[in-house]
Amino acid sequence: MTDSNRGGAAAHSLHAGVYPGNLFMVVAPSGAGKSTLVNALLSKDPEICLSISYTTRKPRSGEQDGQHYHFTTVEDFRARHASHEFLESAEVHGNYYGTSRVWIEEQMKSGHDVLLEIDWQGAQQVKKQFRNAVGIFILPPSLAALEERLKKRGQDEPNVITRRLLAAGSEIAHAAEAEYVVINETFEHALAELECIVAATRLRFTSQYARHAELFVELGIHLPHAE
């Protein structure tokens, strides 16, 4: 797609309330393999941009500010929240997380797909504002497998693992709110399913209309209920 075509599509799609880029929300309980799958998907599909969240939690080993998260203080986070800078925000395990509204809208308007690694609370907030956002819930093959993965990654103390397992049940209960569910039993199969979801989303009527609006208008095809 040329830049001129993308720009033309954007003009029509913004008027119709649809962006050229898609918004994916990946949700999972801690230890389900969400980050590993997302990183693999991003490495294979350069058309997807990862949204980097703001957080007040401490960096883990190997994490870099501006690459994995925008690490900030509670005071700064609250100031940004008061200024309505976040598309969504939530408190998870005692830490605050928030997603930049401006950055996401800029990416989607320019035709880039955006992926959010997000919790179910944040996904609910995003869905209220972007009805075409696609929710993908990653499930473990069993609770026993989830516990084993949390122990093997060696990032949390035993009491934290216990807390995460207790929270997993309530988090998994929200899987029904997602458009798609991927069971991460084997990495390769789960990744292939994620790729299929992305491909199918890009072929939805609204996505195709937003990216090829001039062609659709020429052919007399319009968005349902478009003004």
UniProtKB/Swiss-Prot annotation:
Q: Where in the cell is it found?
A: Cytoplasm
Keyword Nucleotide-binding assigned:
yes
GO molecular function terms noted in the UniProt entry? ATP binding; guanylate kinase activity
Q: Which GO terms describe its cellular component?
A: cytosol
Main site of residence?
Answer: cytoplasm
* Domain Guanylate kinase-like, first and last residues per copy: 21-199
**Keywords tagged on the record:** ATP-binding, Cytoplasm, Kinase, Nucleotide-binding, Transferase
Q: What Gene3D superfamilies would the database entry show? A: Guanylate Kinase phosphate binding domain, P-loop containing nucleotide triphosphate hydrolases
User: Does the record bear Repeat in its keywords?
Assistant: no
Enumerate the PROSITE patterns for this protein: GUANYLATE_KINASE_1 (PS00856), GUANYLATE_KINASE_2 (PS50052)
The family annotation for this protein states:
Belongs to the guanylate kinase family.
Sum up the protein's function in the record's words: Essential for recycling GMP and indirectly, cGMP.
What's the name of the protein? Guanylate kinase
Protein species of origin: Burkholderia thailandensis (strain ATCC 700388 / DSM 13276 / CCUG 48851 / CIP 106301 / E264)
Gene encoding this polypeptide? Answer: gmk
